[in-house]
Amino acid sequence: IWRNYSGLAWTNPYDRRVWDYNIALGEAAAKAGFDEIQFDYVRFPSDGDISSIRYPGEHAQPMGWTIPAFVQYARKRLKPLGVRVSVDMFGLAASHDLGIGQYPSRISRYVDAVYPMVYPSHYNPGEFNLDDPNAVPGITVSYSIADYKKALAGRKAEIIPWLQDFSLGRTYTLADVRDQIEAVRRYNTRGFMLWNAAGVYTDGALKPPPPTTSSPASTTPSG
């Protein structure tokens, strides 16, 4: 067990006992009637003194292939139960090597869908050459989805992004949430999901916008 700066505990991603434990939970959920098993935090640790981490035991594959190997194993165990298998991923995992073992092009080989968490408040100034990605959520989401489309080119896995419906760094408005939704629709993803940790969502965000409404999300990255 390793703990980050917030005291959150991490288990050893290389340890097959950890794999089996998590997959067993998925199997139990599948047998209870759930039709999709979505794994979150499927990655190596961050947000702490990671130089102090030691991973005991066998490392059957290098870090870059450990998470894909886990997902492949999970699929082998779960697919006979008739469920979809999917994973949540960092929004920037398709744009940079984040050092956490999440590689969309590899992981997407073994899942039915990836759910990138493209929360604009989590992007640093200068990302995608934007002075403040959090100030233009629609454009930020567009760039992120464009990178995921490239990373998953030729894959059958669907892209279903998590969008930001919470305030962080500034107050998010109805227009901010709608701008993200419009960006996703322009890329013809399988759909989207909204996230708010408190479960309090913006009223009217899922209603069609007025025909005259324009938004920054209409800008689609080129190249």
Range-by-range predicted roles:
Residues Q38-F39, P45, P62-I100, R155-S167:
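Aromatic-lined carbohydrate-recognition surfaces of secreted/lumenal glycan-active proteins
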Residues A30-K31, I107, R185:
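Non-catalytic positions within long, well-ordered alpha-helices that form the structural scaffold/packing
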Residues A24-F39, R43-P45, A113, M117, ...:
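Alpha/beta enzyme core
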Residues I1-N12, P45-G64:
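Aromatic- and acidic-residue-enriched carbohydrate-binding clefts of CAZyme catalytic domains
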Residues I1-K31:
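Active-site-adjacent "subsite" loops/lids of carbohydrate-active enzymes
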Residues V111-P125, P133-A217, P221-G223:
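Substrate-binding cleft of secreted/luminal carbohydrate-active enzymes
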